[in-house]
């Protein structure tokens, strides 16, 4: 019932521990559930809206960046039924915090075994003292822009080195046959699969927005099998083991399910290629 003494509060017994939990911000019809990092930061009419793509995972969710001046203040999902529908992962939504408050904005040098903040002058002086040769390596981060990586390449070449790396995992992907690496069924098509085999992928963390589509497929009767370390799924799934050797001799129920399937789907993660 409603009355003057009624209070609306949080449900304290269970926290919303989910990689898509912040979508309640978009679902709330009255604005009572708000984006805490963005709250009281700006008015909507002050913001410049830029259409973009989420780069926090390989899914490529459609997003909108709201900025004021040079500062990005919030990230919102854009509707694209073929990719992310109207959803956005918490990782993508709140990565805006790392653009301003929690980022490396100065060089660091290792002195006496410890990393210490330094000025750009000190950093460039340290680089200038490096003896030219093949012992110098340049490692680029996952989120670096092309201009910065090109500058790093020129610096390495000037130091007489060709040791360049931009893959944090060290994996080498063969792109000669793109059909082998693309999600060739389309993301929306995964919902119609009748058997799903997931190899080396923690889908909930690696592609959070894809996981609800797998759940839809499972609710429609699809059988889900996973090769890799166990993780907490949101749908019934059978874990076959964390060794790729399992693929050489799959259990009988798995082979029979794959043989009878009309729309089987295979999802291979980066861990499957290590």
Regions found by a protein language model. Give the residues of each.
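C-type cytochrome heme c attachment motif
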Residues: 5-9, 23-27
């Amino acid at each position: 019932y409603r009355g003057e003494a009624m209070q609306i509060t949080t449900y304290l017994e269970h926290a919303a521990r989910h990689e898509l939990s912040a979508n309640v911000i978009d679902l709330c019809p009255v604005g009572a559930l708000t984006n805490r990092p963005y709250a009281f930061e700006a008015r909507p009419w002050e913001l410049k809206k830029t259409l973009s793509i989420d780069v926090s995972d390989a899914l490529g969710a459609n997003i909108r960046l709201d900025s004021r001046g040079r500062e990005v203040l919030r990230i919102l999902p854009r509707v694209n039924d073929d990719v992310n529908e109207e959803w956005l992962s918490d990782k993508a939504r709140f990565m805006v915090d790392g653009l301003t408050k929690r980022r490396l904005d100065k060089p660091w040098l290792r002195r006496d075994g410890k990393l210490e903040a330094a000025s750009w002058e000190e950093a460039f002086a340290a680089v200038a003292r490096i003896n030219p040769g093949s012992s110098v390596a340049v490692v680029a981060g996952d989120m670096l822009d092309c201009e910065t990586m090109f500058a790093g390449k020129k610096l390495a070449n000037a130091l007489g080195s060709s040791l360049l790396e931009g893959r944090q995992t060290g994996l080498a992907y063969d792109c000669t046959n793109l059909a082998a690496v693309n999600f060739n069924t389309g993301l929306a098509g995964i919902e119609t699969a009748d058997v799903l085999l997931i190899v080396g992928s923690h889908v909930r963390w690696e592609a959070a927005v894809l996981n609800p589509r797998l759940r839809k497929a499972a609710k429609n009767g699809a059988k889900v099998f996973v090769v890799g370390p166990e993780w907490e799924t949101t749908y019934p799934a059978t874990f076959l083991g964390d060794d790729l050797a399992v693929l050489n001799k799959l259990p009988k129920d798995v082979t029979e399910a794959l043989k009878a399937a009309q729309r089987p789907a295979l999802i291979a993660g980066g861990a499957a290629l290590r």
